[in-house]
Amino acid sequence: GGLTLQGLDDNAAGLGVMLELAERLKNIPTKYSIRFVATSGEEEGKLGAENLLKRMSAEEKKNTLLVINLDNLIVGDKLYFNSGQSTPSSVRKLTRDRALALARTHGVYAATNPGGNPQYPKGTGCCNDGEVFDKAGIPVLYVEATNWALGKKDGYQQRSKSKAFPDGTSWHDVRLDNQQHIDKALPQRIEHRSRDVVKVMLPLVKELAKAGKA
């Protein structure tokens, strides 16, 4: 789609949520530093994430306690929180499991990969920028909306096939991944899902960074 592709689901909404979190956290002191990063070139081979990792020193890698990957938050049936395959179980509890608990507390429907495909074990995610850091041994929390029960059960098919979304996906399609189409097919989904993600991620990031009072 080039310059005509809005890419609202993939991944303008993810960027918007990240900026909202940055705005809300900017005046709050934290024990652990938070870095907000937008990487490009994911579709061409995770080029931005690879470049970022390559430029990190050994000390920076060691001090990176968690990477949170926000991607494809709108069109998918369900909001998912998944861990990187190399993420230790202790970190999974503090991140993925805590996110699911916060979602329940705030009335947000969320799930984790049920593990229907042996290549993607239960509770883990894959196939986006977070994977670069996962392979480098850095803990990852994937935040996405899709439906891991459909298709090859690999998280690729976001929702059931329909007239509005013939392949059950919207990404990379200039006709489908835009505000006008999504608003018509899924009224108020953009606003509601974006708010839901912030409802969970804001308290989670505050907890993890050991935030003080503004």
Describe each PLM feature range.
Residues 1, 64, 68, 165-170:
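Short coil-to-beta-strand
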Residues 1-46, 201:
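Alpha-helical metal-binding/catalytic segments enriched in His/Glu/Asp
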Residues 2-11, 24, 38-39, 79-90, ...:
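Second-shell loop/turn segments in exported
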Residues 1, 75-79, 153, 171:
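Short acidic/His/Gly/Ser-rich catalytic and metal-binding motifs that mark active-site loops
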Residues 150-214:
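His/Asp/Glu-rich mid-to-C-terminal helical/loop segments that flank catalytic regions of hydrolases
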Residues 29, 39-142, 147-148:
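Metal-dependent peptidase/peptidase-like ectodomains
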Residues 15-23, 50, 54, 97, ...:
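Solvent-exposed, polar/charged alpha-helical surfaces in well-ordered, non-transmembrane soluble domains
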